[in-house]
From Swiss-Prot:
GO terms for biological process: protein sumoylation. Its main location: cytoplasm. GO terms for cellular component: cytoplasm; nucleus; PML body. CDD domains: Ubl_SUMO2_3_4. SUPFAM superfamilies: Ubiquitin-like. This is Small ubiquitin-related modifier 3. Keywords: Cytoplasm, Isopeptide bond, Nucleus, Ubl conjugation, Ubl conjugation pathway. Residues 15-92 form the Ubiquitin-like domain. Ubiquitin-like protein which can be covalently attached to target lysines either as a monomer or as a lysine-linked polymer. Does not seem to be involved in protein degradation and may function as an antagonist of ubiquitin in the degradation process. Plays a role in a number of cellular processes such as nuclear transport, DNA replication and repair, mitosis and signal transduction. Covalent attachment to its substrates requires prior activation by the E1 complex SAE1-SAE2 and linkage to the E2 enzyme UBE2I, and can be promoted by an E3 ligase such as PIAS1-4, RANBP2 or CBX4. Disulfide bonds: none annotated. Pfam families: Rad60-SLD (PF11976). There is a cross-link at residue 92 (Glycyl lysine isopeptide (Gly-Lys) (interchain with K-? in acceptor proteins)). InterPro entries: Rad60/SUMO-like_dom, Ubiquitin-like_dom, Ubiquitin-like_domsf.
Length: 104
């Protein structure tokens, strides 16, 4: 029976996952998070560390937006996976305005 305790310890260790958060500037920040912890915790910690507002940026994994309630387990994330961070764009671009204005 005493052999089961180390197995529990291994299970606890496997409950954590190391994730990388990659910014558009090439910076990478690493986080260790439990597989069933909402990613909002990681997102808020990243914003605090980088001096950003949650309203300024968007997080994506495998090209799909991440919701604050998503967990690594739900998104089937694996150890050392990368989350991409993008600054939210506000308004239209000059090119789009020019194209729309020209009737194209």
């Amino acid at each position: 029976m005493s052999e089961e305790k180390p197995k529990e310890g291994v299970k606890t260790e496997n409950d954590h996952i190391n994730l990388k958060v990659a910014g558009q500037d090439g910076s990478v920040v690493q986080f260790k998070i439990k597989r069933h912890t909402p990613l909002s915790k990681l997102m808020k910690a990243y914003c605090e560390r980088q001096g950003l507002s949650m309203r300024q940026i968007r997080f994506r994994f495998d090209g799909q937006p991440i919701n604050e309630t998503d967990t690594p387990a739900q998104l089937e994330m694996e150890d050392e996976d990368t989350i991409d961070v993008f600054q939210q764009q506000t308004g239209g671009s000059r090119v789009a305005s020019c194209l729309l204005g020209s009737g194209l």
